[in-house]
Design a protein with these regions (language model features):
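Intrinsically disordered, low-complexity Pro/Gly/Ser/Thr-rich segments with frequent PxxP/GP/PP motifs
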Residues: 221-257
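Secreted, periplasmic, or luminal enzymes acting at the cell surface/secretory milieu
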Residues: 1-9, 76-208, 214, 234, ...
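Hydrophobic helix-and-loop "lid/oligomerization" segment in the mid-to-C-terminal part
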Residues: 2-88
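Short acidic, flexible loop segments centered on an aromatic residue
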Residues: 204-221, 227-229
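Domain-level signal for soluble alpha/beta catalytic cores
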Residues: 21, 193, 203, 220-222
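Short, contiguous acidic/charged loop-to-helix segments that flank catalytic cores in large enzymes
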Residues: 45-55, 59, 95-99, 185-187, ...
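Terminal connector regions
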Residues: 250-290
Length: 290
């Protein structure tokens, strides 16, 4: 392997280093590209209006990706960035944010498969800065997301979904989800609701999966988010095995503050979603009773 560093030099030196990187990339089996923000781009009084990768790094990435499409990107960042081009031209992205003193060792172990990435995104990554703010628990509008007309919630030049959504993350195996099972179809105040689902590891390697439970209150006296994360469990599943993941919800999980700022329970229909991330669509319904 060969290591190349320090591309943020004067223009002439930068061009020479990029040309050298291209020559090496042409012969390489795989390119590991470490890119991202400067450490000073984050922290107190470090807001940005431009969430692109720095221009110098974009030049390097475009030049290398033009001669080698087997790129693994390691991303150092303080915030969600515009990764459209990086995502399209990378076989994988390992988002490490800004790790501590043992970060380098952990990154190497993950890249070589000695350990597996198990993290999940705590924020959405937009497709462009024009999509901001973008978050999974937005409020619904009077225009649906999909409809056979132009009067919908969305954009004419981009999908409405973020590039990477809240709760997303991959590892070195694959999981399949079964059907959601609820222990009751009607919930009264003072009772609990148990929701369960079977998760199977369909890969050839043991792994951990973070199973996430979201709810949606369809009808309420105030507008409620399209999804709310209420529970999650990180479970180990051996290759080829299936585990049953169970969640217990209490009445407080369905309460909210009304317009009088009272913490209330309102009868109505609740959808229970369980899946890999906030984009999950499979659900079962429970009715909140008087």
């Amino acid at each position: 392997y060969q290591l190349l560093t320090d591309f943020e030099a004067d223009p002439k030196a930068r061009r020479e280093k990029i040309e050298n990187a291209v020559k090496i990339a042409e012969k390489a089996d795989v390119v590991v590209m470490l890119i991202g923000e400067h450490p000073r781009f984050g922290g107190e009084k470090a807001a940005r209006v431009n969430i692109d990768i720095p221009i110098i790094q974009q030049e390097l990435f475009r030049a290398v990706s033009a001669v080698n499409d087997n790129i693994v990107t390691v991303l150092f960042n303080h915030r969600p960035l515009d990764l459209r081009e990086i995502s399209a031209k990378s076989k994988a992205i390992l988002d490490v944010w800004f790790p501590g003193t043992k970060g380098a060792e952990g990154i190497v172990n993950m890249l070589f498969g000695d350990t597996a990435p198990e993290g999940r995104l705590s924020m959405c990554f937009p497709r462009s800065v024009g999509q901001c703010p973008v978050f999974y628990n937005m409020l619904p509008t009077d225009h649906p997301v999909t409809l056979p007309s132009r009067f919908v919630t969305g954009y004419i030049d981009s999908p409405i979904e973020p590039l990477y959504s809240f709760g997303e993350g991959m590892t070195y195996t694959e999981f399949e989800y079964g059907e959601i099972v609820l222990d009751k179809s009607e919930l009264h105040e003072g009772e609990t609701l148990t929701a369960s689902i079977k998760v199977k590891n369909v890969g050839d390697r043991d792994g951990y999966e973070t199973v996430q439970l979201y709810i949606r209150d369809l009808y309420a006296s105030v507008s409620r988010p399209v999804k709310e994360l209420k529970r999650f469990k990180k479970v180990e599943v051996k290759a080829g095995e299936t585990v049953n993941v169970e969640f217990t919800l209490t009445c407080d999980d369905f309460r909210f503050h009304n317009i009088q700022m009272e913490y209330v329970w309102e009868p109505g229909e609740i959808r229970i979603f369980i899946g890999k991330n906030s984009l999950c669509t499979e659900y079962k319904t429970v009715m909140l009773a008087e």
